[in-house]
C-alpha cells in the first residue's frame, strides 16, 4: 500500500512539473537602425522549453500582436516591417512542450530612424553581428556554434572571434565589463579543464591543440572532426586578445590572464610539425586513428600565417624561426586586374590574421623585397577582387562595384572556398564577410558595399544576427544561416578600421612580438615631413626627403588614434624629394579642412 501511494505521489509530482507554466523571458533588449528593429532576450533554463513568441505594439499599453508565425528557437527576432520615426514596443513569451505560454516579458521599445552617419550604420552592423556570439553561444561553457541552424556543433575558431567581439561589445556599451569578463572566464575554463588525450571521443583536444568542432554541451570532440592547427590558432588569437583586454586586478580578470597564458603555453607547436628536418612545416591536422597521415603542411600565403607567427614566438615547444622561410617559399606574386600582390583567391586568407596582427608598419624579407606590407597586400587583393567582379568575365548576375566579395562561405550547393583568379572558383556567390573583413585595409570600397547591401537588400539579407552568410543572385538563392567564422571578422575588422583597438591590444602580447622578430620582421621608418596648405583650393601638399625609386605611403588621422591609408597616397620617389597633395576624395575619405584637425604621417616601404 505504501509503495502504491508513493507511486501516486511521484506521478502527481511529474505531472505537476510537466504542466508548470514557463517563466517570462528576462533581460529583453531592443535596438534599431534604418527601417529595421532587433529584439533579444536571455535563454530560459526551464524544462521542456519549446520556443518563444514575439509581440509588437504601437503603444506601451498594447494591444500587442504576435509577429512570428512559428515558434522561435533562437534568442532573437528581426522586425523588418517597421517605419522610421515610429516607436515600437515589444514583449516576448516562452512556450513549453505542452504549449503553455509564460506571462509576457517586460516591455521594451525602440525608435527606428535613418542612419545619421556612417558611424551610426557601423554601430548597428557591429552590434547585430556581435549578438550572434552572445545569444547563440552556450552561456554555461562559452562555446559558440559553427552556424545558427539548430543542432550545430561548436566551431573553436568561432569561439576565438567571439572572445574578441566581447571586448568590442564592452567598449561600445552593449554589455557590461562584468558580464563580458564572466563569459570569457567561463570559456577559458572550458578549454583549460577539458580532457586532453588520444581517445576517439570524450576529449577536447591533445597536446594543447583542440578539435575543430566540439559538442555544444559536452565540450568534447564532435563526430570525426580533426585536431585543427588553424582553428586552434584562431581560438588562441581571441584568447591572447582577452588576456590583454581584461587587465584588471580583480579575481575574475586575473584568472582570465593566468588561464589564457596557461592555455597558450600548453600548446605543443613542435609536435604539430613532424616533417623531416629542414622543412619545419606545420601540419593542418591530426586524427586519433591515423595521426598526421591524411594532412598536408601549411605553406604559401593564406590564413595559416598566424600559426607560424605564434608558434615561432612561443616560449615552450616552439617552432624554429626557419619555419617562416618554409612558409613564404610557397608564395606566388602575380598581377591581376591592375594589382600586384601575393595571391590567395578567397579573401578570408587575406583577412583572418589581420583581425589581430597589425602589419601596417612592419615587413619581412619577402614583403620588403616587393616594396609592400602584408596590410597593403590585403588591400590590393580586395581591390583586385572588386575589379574582377566589375569585369564579371563569367556573367554572374548582379556583380558590380558595390556587389563583390568572394570567400569561403555557404553557397547553393553547400559550402565552398570561392575566389577570383588565379585559382578562380566562382559560382556567383557573394559573402558579406568578404567586404566586412576588408574594412580595415579597403574602407573606400568596403563601406559603400556594406551600406548598399543593407539599404537595398535588407529585406532578404538582414537578420537578428546581422547579414546572412551569403547569397547568389544567379541562382536566386539566399542563405538561411549565419556563420561564426564569417560574422566575427565583420565585427573585428570594422573595429580595427575605426580605432585599431583590437590590433593595438593584441600586439602587446610578447608572444606575437617575439614571433615577428624571429621571423625577420623589421619596423618601417617614418619620414620627417613639411606641409604647405592652400585653404582656398582645399589642398595640402606634403614633402619629405626621399631616396630615388623608393616607395612611400601616406596615412592620415583626425585624432591621432584612428589612422587611415590614403587610397592615392602610395608615392614612388623620382629624386631626393618626394611630395603628395591631398585634394580630398579619393585621396582621403572626407574633404580636407572639414575636420577640426588633420594629421599626416608617411612611412617608407622596403628594407630600411
What do these predicted ranges mean?
Residues 27-28, 525-608:
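Short, composition-biased motifs enriched in small/polar/acidic residues
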Residues 42-63, 547-555:
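Solvent-exposed loop/turn segments flanking beta-strands in beta-repeat/beta-sandwich domains
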Residues 6-15:
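Bacterial N-terminal signal peptides
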Residues 110-525:
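Ser/Thr/Asn(+Pro)-rich, low-complexity disordered segments
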Residues 1-4:
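Positively charged n-region of N-terminal signal peptides that target proteins for export
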Residues 79-100, 595-597, 603-606:
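Beta-strand-rich modules
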Residues 50-85, 97-108, 562-591:
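Recognizes extended acidic, P/S/T-rich segments that occur
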Residues 20-50, 84, 96-116, 528-536, ...:
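Pro/Thr/Ser/Gly-rich low-complexity, intrinsically disordered linker/stalk tracts
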Amino acid at each position: 500500500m505504501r509503495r502504491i501511494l508513493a507511486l501516486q505521489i511521484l506521478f502527481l509530482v511529474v505531472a505537476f512539473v510537466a504542466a508548470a507554466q514557463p517563466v517570462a523571458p528576462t533581460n529583453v533588449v531592443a535596438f534599431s537602425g534604418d527601417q529595421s528593429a532587433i529584439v533579444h532576450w536571455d535563454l530560459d533554463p526551464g524544462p521542456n522549453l519549446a520556443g518563444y513568441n514575439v509581440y509588437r505594439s504601437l503603444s506601451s499599453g498594447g494591444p500587442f500582436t504576435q509577429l512570428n508565425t512559428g515558434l522561435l528557437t533562437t534568442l532573437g527576432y528581426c522586425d523588418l516591417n517597421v517605419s522610421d520615426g515610429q516607436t515600437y514596443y515589444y514583449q516576448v513569451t516562452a512556450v513549453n512542450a505542452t504549449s503553455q505560454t509564460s506571462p509576457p516579458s517586460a516591455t521594451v521599445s525602440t525608435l527606428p530612424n535613418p542612419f545619421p552617419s556612417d558611424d551610426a550604420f557601423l554601430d548597428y552592423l557591429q552590434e547585430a553581428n556581435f549578438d550572434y556570439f552572445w545569444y547563440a553561444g552556450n552561456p554555461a561553457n562559452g562555446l559558440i556554434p559553427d552556424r545558427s541552424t539548430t543542432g550545430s556543433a561548436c566551431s573553436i575558431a568561432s569561439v576565438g572571434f567571439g572572445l574578441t567581439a566581447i571586448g568590442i561589445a564592452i567598449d561600445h556599451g552593449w554589455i557590461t565589463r562584468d558580464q563580458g569578463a564572466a563569459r570569457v572566464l567561463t570559456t577559458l575554463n572550458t578549454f583549460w579543464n577539458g580532457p586532453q588525450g588520444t581517445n576517439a571521443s570524450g576529449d577536447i583536444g591533445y597536446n594543447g591543440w583542440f578539435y575543430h568542432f566540439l559538442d555544444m554541451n559536452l565540450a568534447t570532440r564532435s563526430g570525426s572532426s580533426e585536431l585543427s592547427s588553424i582553428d586552434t590558432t584562431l581560438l588562441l588569437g581571441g584568447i591572447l586578445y582577452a588576456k590583454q583586454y581584461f587587465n584588471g586586478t580583480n579575481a575574475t580578470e586575473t584568472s582570465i590572464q593566468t588561464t589564457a597564458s596557461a592555455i597558450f603555453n600548453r600548446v605543443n607547436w613542435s609536435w604539430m610539425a613532424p616533417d623531416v628536418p629542414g622543412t619545419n612545416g606545420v601540419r593542418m591536422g591530426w586524427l586519433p586513428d591515423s595521426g598526421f597521415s591524411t594532412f598536408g603542411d601549411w605553406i604559401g600565403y593564406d590564413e595559416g600565417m598566424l600559426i607560424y607567427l605564434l608558434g615561432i614566438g612561443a616560449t615552450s615547444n616552439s617552432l624554429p624561426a626557419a619555419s617562416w622561410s618554409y612558409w613564404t617559399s610557397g608564395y606566388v606574386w602575380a598581377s591581376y586586374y591592375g594589382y600586384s600582390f601575393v595571391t590567395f583567391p578567397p579573401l578570408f586568407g587575406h583577412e583572418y590574421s589581420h583581425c589581430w596582427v597589425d602589419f601596417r608598419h612592419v615587413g619581412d624579407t619577402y614583403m620588403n623585397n616587393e616594396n609592400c606590407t602584408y596590410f597593403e597586400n590585403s588591400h590590393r587583393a580586395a581591390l583586385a577582387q572588386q575589379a574582377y567582379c566589375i569585369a564579371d568575365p563569367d556573367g554572374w548576375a548582379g556583380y558590380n562595384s558595390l556587389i563583390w566579395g568572394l570567400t569561403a562561405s555557404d553557397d547553393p550547393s553547400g559550402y565552398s572556398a570561392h575566389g577570383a583568379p588565379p585559382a578562380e572558383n566562382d559560382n556567383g556567390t557573394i559573402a558579406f564577410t568578404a567586404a566586412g573583413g576588408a574594412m580595415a585595409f579597403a574602407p573606400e570600397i568596403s563601406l559603400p558595399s556594406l551600406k548598399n547591401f543593407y539599404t537595398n537588400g535588407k529585406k532578404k539579407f538582414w537578420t537578428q544576427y546581422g547579414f546572412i552568410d551569403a547569397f547568389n543572385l544567379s541562382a536566386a538563392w539566399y542563405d538561411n544561416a549565419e556563420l561564426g567564422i564569417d560574422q566575427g571578422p565583420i565585427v573585428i575588422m570594422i573595429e580595427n578600421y575605426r580605432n585599431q583597438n583590437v590590433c593595438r591590444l593584441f600586439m602587446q602580447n610578447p608572444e606575437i612580438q617575439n614571433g615577428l622578430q624571429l621571423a625577420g620582421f623589421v619596423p618601417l621608418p617614418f619620414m620627417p615631413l613639411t606641409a604647405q596648405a592652400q585653404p582656398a583650393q582645399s589642398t595640402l601638399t606634403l614633402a619629405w626627403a626621399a631616396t630615388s625609386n623608393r616607395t612611400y605611403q601616406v596615412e592620415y588621422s583626425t585624432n591621432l588614434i584612428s589612422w587611415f591609408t590614403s587610397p592615392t597616397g602610395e608615392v614612388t620617389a623620382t629624386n631626393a624629394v618626394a611630395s603628395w597633395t591631398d585634394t580630398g576624395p579619393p585621396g582621403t575619405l572626407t574633404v580636407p579642412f572639414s575636420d577640426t584637425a588633420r594629421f599626416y604621417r608617411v612611412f617608407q616601404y622596403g628594407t630600411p
